[in-house]
Every structure is written in structure tokens, then in C-alpha cells.
From Swiss-Prot:
PANTHER family: RING FINGER PROTEIN 113B, ZINC FINGER PROTEIN 183. The keyword Ligase does not apply. This is Pre-mRNA-splicing factor CWC24. Residues 72-86 have a biased composition (Acidic residues). GO terms for biological process: mRNA processing; snoRNA splicing. It is found in: Nucleus. The keyword Protein biosynthesis does not apply. The lineage of its organism: Eukaryota, Fungi, Dikarya, Basidiomycota, Agaricomycotina. Residues 1-86, 298-329 are annotated as: Disordered. Associated with the spliceosome. GO terms for molecular function: DNA binding; zinc ion binding. Residues 310-320 have a biased composition (Gly residues). InterPro entries: CWC24-like (IPR039971), Znf_CCCH (IPR000571), Znf_CCCH_sf (IPR036855), Znf_RING (IPR001841), Znf_RING/FYVE/PHD (IPR013083), Znf_RING_CS (IPR017907). Residues 298-308 have a biased composition (Basic and acidic residues).
Length: 329
């Protein structure tokens, strides 16, 4: 016998059941359909919403009121103007000329005025300028009064403390006078350990600032002595920064005074300029001595020339006393 096929089970989805009293949303009528709007107004009642009262709050700003007013005016006039336009302009009384701000001033240190008032309360003077005695109450160490009577201006200057009051003028004129970067060692001694790699200027001339040039007289400018630039020989000791006294030279070629070199050798056997070992050998500096003698000779000759010029055309005082005495006799 042949077996019968098994029955196929089929599943069928049943209809969805909805409660009979379910609330359905009414279709909103189109604004272009006046018939539907009329039927809706006749069949049902409209929702009335309460109007919100606008409170005057300065922190809340908007353009709704201006837009509403503009639309109302547009409907009345028939011309669209949009939102109101405002023109902002500064007050005419604030305009000033350029020259008026040149001497503009302001009180920057207002705290100083209060401090002055507190000092006036502490130190009180009568009509004669005498300090008014205290009433006997103890008010702390800060309330002590000076025992020596002084004037009001002196008391104000002595008792004032703190930073200096800033200028009250807004516009100031400042002059900046910069000092040139001149090598101090080369200017004072004629020698610099850095040599050509020194970042400062190697010049022995005198540089004056602007305020120093203003103090110089117009006449009688000192003559600048010409120096021999071919031979770089120092003119002052590197240790004492004074003109040489008994100049000596080391093996490394640096010049010092005899006394300065001896004191330096007692502390350290190395050279003061370059740090090389000197081994206690100091030779006589013939070049420096010759340069000093040439300079002294030039000064003597210049002094003699000046004496001859002043002596030849000068006025002799009491030169004719002998002749007058002989004539009287």
C-alpha cells in the first residue's frame, strides 16, 4: 500500500480588529477650498486660543511688532515699505577739533586723592600751622603724629609713599637717545680679547648723547688728537685701567704695569688677558715706552707753542716801572 501524503498546514492572517469607538482625526480643510471650510465651520466649533500678553522686557527684542505695523501700513497705503529703517548719527556736541585734543588730560590715579584725604585726617594743622593734639584715644601705630612741627608741604612729601603719580596728559612727546655699543675694554685699554670677532665697535673716540651735546659750548671745542692707527699698541693697563707705569709685556704679547703684573702672578701664573701661562717672564715694553715718550714730547711742543703765542701778544703788567723811576730821578 502506498502511504498518503501529509496534509499541508496553511496560516492565514485574520482581519485586524479595531474598537468601534475609536477616535478618528478629521481631515484639515485646504485654505483654497471655501466649501469645505464653510461645512467645517457649520458642523463643528473652532478652537479658540487665548492671546498671550507681551510683557515689556528690555532683554527680549524682536521685529514682530515692527513687521506687523509695516504690513498694516502697506495694506492701507498700498505701497510696500518693509521694516523701518533707522539712521544712526553721533551727537553734534561731541565733535572736537584736532588741536583741542593736544592738551587733553585725565585723572588716572584717583586712589591717590583718597589717600591724601586719609593723611589729612591723620595730621591736622590749625591756623598757625601747629599740629593739633590728639584727644587721647589710641588708634594704632599708624595714627602716630610727628613730634616736630613742619610745614604742610614737607609733611605731604615725607608721608607720601608708593609709586609716582603718572602724568595726567594723554598725549606726550618722548625722545629716545640710544647709546652706541662700543667695546669698553678696547676703548679704555686698546685691547680686546675677542679680537675681530667682538660684536661691539672697536673705536677709541668719544661718543656723546644728545643731552650731552646740548651742554657743550658752541665755541672752544676741544681738538681731537690724532693717534697712530697703524700699530695697535694699548695705552692703558688692562688690570688697573690707568696709564702705564713701568710697562712690561708677556710672552703672549699683552702689556701690563710692572706692579699689576707682579700682583697678578702671585694670585695666578696665567695671563690676565688670554689665560696663557706666563712662567713669571715679563719683559720691558719698548714699544709702549717709545709711544709714551713720543706723546709726552708732542704735548711739550704744543705747550711751548701755546706759551709763545700767548707771551708774544700778551699784556705786560708792571713792565715799565724801572723806566718811570729813572725818568722821575
Amino acid at each position: 500500500m502506498s502511504e498518503a501524503p501529509a496534509p499541508v498546514v496553511t496560516f492565514k492572517k485574520g482581519p485586524s480588529r479595531r474598537p468601534a469607538q475609536s477616535r478618528q482625526r478629521r481631515r484639515s480643510p485646504s485654505p483654497l477650498d471655501p466649501v469645505a471650510e464653510a461645512s467645517a465651520s457649520a458642523s463643528g466649533s473652532n478652537v479658540v486660543r487665548p492671546e498671550r500678553k507681551s510683557l515689556a522686557n528690555p532683554l527680549v527684542q524682536g521685529t514682530k511688532r515692527r513687521r506687523t505695523n509695516a504690513n498694516n501700513e502697506e495694506e492701507e497705503d498700498g505701497v510696500g515699505g518693509g521694516l523701518d529703517e533707522f539712521d544712526y548719527a553721533a551727537e553734534g556736541g561731541l565733535t572736537r577739533k584736532g588741536d583741542e585734543l593736544a592738551t587733553r588730560a585725565n585723572d588716572w590715579d584717583l586712589e591717590d586723592v583718597d589717600g591724601q584725604g586719609q593723611r589729612d585726617k591723620k595730621v591736622r594743622l590749625d591756623e598757625d600751622g601747629e599740629i593739633v593734639t590728639d584727644d587721647g584715644l589710641y588708634r594704632g601705630a599708624s595714627a602716630y603724629l610727628p613730634t616736630i612741627n613742619k610745614t604742610r608741604e614737607t609733611l605731604d612729601k615725607k608721608m607720601k609713599s608708593g609709586p609716582i603719580k603718572a602724568t595726567s596728559h594723554v598725549r606726550t612727546i618722548t625722545l629716545m637717545d640710544y647709546q652706541p655699543d662700543v667695546c669698553k675694554d678696547y676703548k679704555e685699554t686698546g685691547f680686546c680679547g675677542y679680537g675681530d670677532s667682538c660684536k661691539f665697535l672697536h673705536d677709541r673716540g668719544d661718543y656723546l648723547a644728545g643731552w650731552q651735546l646740548d651742554k657743550l659750548p658752541e665755541e672752544g671745542v676741544r681738538e681731537v688728537e690724532e693717534e697712530d692707527e697703524e700699530e695697535e699698541v694699548p695705552f692703558a693697563c688692562l688690570i688697573c685701567r690707568q696709564p702705564f707705569t713701568q710697562p712690561v709685556v708677556t710672552k703672549c704679547g699683552h702689556y701690563f704695569c710692572m706692579g699689576c703684573a707682579a700682583k697678578r702672578f702671585q694670585k695666578s701664573p696665567k695671563c690676565y688677558a688670554c689665560g696663557a701661562p706666563t712662567q713669571g717672564i715679563f719683559n720691558i715694553a719698548d714699544k709702549v715706552i717709545a709711544k709714551i715718550e713720543a706723546r709726552n714730547k708732542a704735548r711739550r711742543e704744543a705747550r711751548e707753542e701755546r706759551a709763545e703765542q700767548t707771551g708774544g701778544g700778551g699784556i705786560e703788567i708792571g713792565g715799565g716801572s724801572d723806566e718811570e723811576g729813572s725818568d722821575e730821578e
